[in-house]
Each structure stands twice: as structure tokens, then as C-alpha cells.
Amino acid sequence: MKIETPINILVRRRAAIGDVIMSTGVVRELKKQYEQANIDVVTEKLAVWRNNPHIRNMYHVNDPPPIENYDLYINLDNAYEANPVNHFVDSMFYRAFGDNVLDHSVELFPDAADCQLVDEFLEPVGNRFIVVHMRNWHYAQKNISMDVWFAVYARLFGSRTDFKVICVGGSTDYMIDHPLFVDAREQFNDQQLKYLCDQALCFVGIDSGPYWAAAASKAPIVALLTNIPVESILPHRKRVMGYDCIAVPTLEECRGCYNEQQRPVVIWTCKKGTTPCNNNFDVAAIATAIESYL
């Protein structure tokens, strides 16, 4: 087809970091479908789009461009929140393309400076390490208790100590003061974290920004899940949902309760009131999953 005037496309996903990373595959596939198109994005999390070769401009949600300047506007806000029984990324793709068999993988693009910074950080660490996100922030159901984490590490280090644990995330997330642990919280941007995970033996964590940065990498993932069903959140890689991933859901019988929440799911309520899911895991299963990648 001869296209004399490329179309202008605007894609919006307000937040959060993980959700914006989920939307990167949509933009890539739009660029494949409309090769000459000019694609702009609007979001709170502008840093996710740094170095992305598929976009022209990025705008903050507080200062968006006029929608009438675009031939096609795709609003991915509440795409999966309104349709939670699907894989979250699949719901985003459906809003953009309808039913499709496109590549639903996510992506981030570290540049040479990003890689150099991470490589220098890793010089004293060595090449045998796992990346772990011990989340401690909003939404208690996602904050796996330290009792679980300590039990996992006791099993791991009881049999071997030939690797280190690099802890990532924000300042509120957990870190353990121990010679085998390395504190990398608040040290890396999304692209650098992706590159760090590329070098790792595996990534361990729950649905979060670091989890989706790892999803963009080649690192195996040990996914610890509570309120979100396995089939909704394991990343797509090589056109396979959950490729090179091991899911370890909570043992609570109400696991995956995200699907039971009021639509769109922007407020989550625990029917038990105490989020016991974050402290009820098969510790041996987690340790075994990690050991399989060491």
C-alpha cells in the first residue's frame, strides 16, 4: 500500500511503572502495523519510554497534546482493570487491535551508558547473582512478609553460598544486612534494571515495576503471586506466556482474588481483612525454584 501521509498515533497509559512497561509491546506492534506512523505516548512514567525507538514524542499526563491532532488515539487506562479475567497485557492488546495473535512481549532499551554503569556496579559482585525485589509499599497483599523471605534464604544458604543476592526496588523495600546481599535499591532506572537482570541467574519477586523490568530481560523469573492469578501476570516471551518462568502462588485458598473485585479494579479489598496471603507460601517450593536456576 502506498501511504503518502503517515498517520499520527497517540497512546496513553497513565501509570504505574509496571503497567506502562506492559504497554510497550502495544506500541512496538503498532509501529509494525503502521510502519511509517508517528507514535507519541502520554504517561506519568516518562522514564519507561527513554531510548524507545518506536516513538516520536512523549508527554506527561498533566500536559498532553490535543487529541484532535491525531488520526488514532488509543487509551490503555483501565484496559485490564475493566477486563481482569484475561492476561493483563492481552487486555491492552485487545483494546488496541481487537482479537489478535501479535507478539505480546514487553521491552526496554538500555543505552551504552546504562550498560557501562551496571557493568561497573557488578565488578565487585561477580557474575553469580540473583536479583530480588522484596517489596514493601502500598497494597499489603503484595508485600511478602520477611518471615517468608528469611525462611527462603535459610534454605538456600543452608546448601550453598556461591552466589549473591542483589536487592532492587525503592527506599521502602526490604534489604538484609549480610555479606551475601548487595543493596541496589534506588540505584538503577528501568533500562538499567533490565540490563542488570540480563546478567542475573534469575529474578525473584511479585508483580511490580522491577518485575516488569525483569520481564523485558532474558532473566528467568520466579514469580511469587498473591491476589493476581498466574494466568493474568506471567510475562509473554518468545510468544509463550510464562516462558522461562516459575510461578509460586500463595497457599491461601482465596489466591487470585483480583478477578472477584468490583470493575474496574482500581480499589482492592481483602475479604479476610488481614491479607494472610502475603505470609503463606510454600517456602521449599520457592527455594527449589530459585535453585533450579543457580
Give the ranges of each region predicted by the language model.
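Catalytic machinery of carbohydrate-active enzymes
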Residues: 1-294
